Amino acid sequence: MSMVYFNIFMAFTVSFVGLLMYRSHLMSSLLCLEGMMLSLFVMMSMTILNNHFTLANMAPIILLVFAACEAALGLSLLVMVSNTYGTDYVQNLNLLQC
C-alpha cells in the first residue's frame, strides 16, 4: 500500500472515529460524514485511474451526486431541527419520544 492510499485511508478512519465520538450534535455528524465521502471519492478516483478501469469512470461522479444529495438533506434536517427545538442535538431526532 502506497503512502497516498494510506493517508486517504487514515482520513477516512479519522472521520469515522469523529462520527462515533461527536455524535451528539447534528452539525459535527454531518461534517464527519462529508469527510468520509470526500476520502471515498479520492480513493475511488485514484483506484480507477491507476488500474485503468474504463467502465467505472462514472462511479466517482455518481458518488459525488449522492454526497450532494446527502448534504442537502442533512442541512435541511439541521435547519428544521434547529428551528423547532432551538438546538442541533441528535437526541431531538428520536421519533419514539413524546
UniProtKB/Swiss-Prot annotation:
Q: Which InterPro entries match?
A: NADH_UbQ_OxRdtase_chain4L/K, NUOK/Mnh_C1-like
Transmembrane helix as a keyword of this entry, yes or no, is yes
Q: What is its EC number?
A: 7.1.1.2
List cellular component terms (GO). mitochondrial inner membrane; respiratory chain complex I
Bilayer-crossing residues are 1-21, 29-49, 61-81
Q: Where in the cell?
A: Mitochondrion inner membrane
Keyword Secreted among UniProt keywords: no
Regarding the membrane, this protein is recorded as: Multi-pass membrane protein
Main localization category? mitochondrion
Q: Which GO biological process annotations does it have?
A: ATP synthesis coupled electron transport
- Identify the keywords attached in UniProt to this record, alphabetized: Electron transport, Membrane, Mitochondrion, Mitochondrion inner membrane, NAD, Respiratory chain, Translocase, Transmembrane, Transmembrane helix, Transport, Ubiquinone
Q: GO MF annotations for this entry?
A: NADH dehydrogenase (ubiquinone) activity
Give me the reactions it catalyses.
a ubiquinone + NADH + 5 H(+)(in) = a ubiquinol + NAD(+) + 4 H(+)(out)
Per its UniProt entry, which superkingdom is the organism in?
Eukaryota
UniProt-listed PANTHER family: NADH-UBIQUINONE OXIDOREDUCTASE CHAIN 4L, NADH-UBIQUINONE OXIDOREDUCTASE SUBUNIT ND4L
Q: What does the UniProt record say this protein does? A: Core subunit of the mitochondrial membrane respiratory chain NADH dehydrogenase (Complex I) which catalyzes electron transfer from NADH through the respiratory chain, using ubiquinone as an electron acceptor. Part of the enzyme membrane arm which is embedded in the lipid bilayer and involved in proton translocation.
Q: Which family does it belong to?
A: Belongs to the complex I subunit 4L family.
**Subunit notes for this chain?**
Core subunit of respiratory chain NADH dehydrogenase (Complex I) which is composed of 45 different subunits.
Full protein name: NADH-ubiquinone oxidoreductase chain 4L
Which species expresses this protein natively? Phocarctos hookeri (Hooker's sea lion)
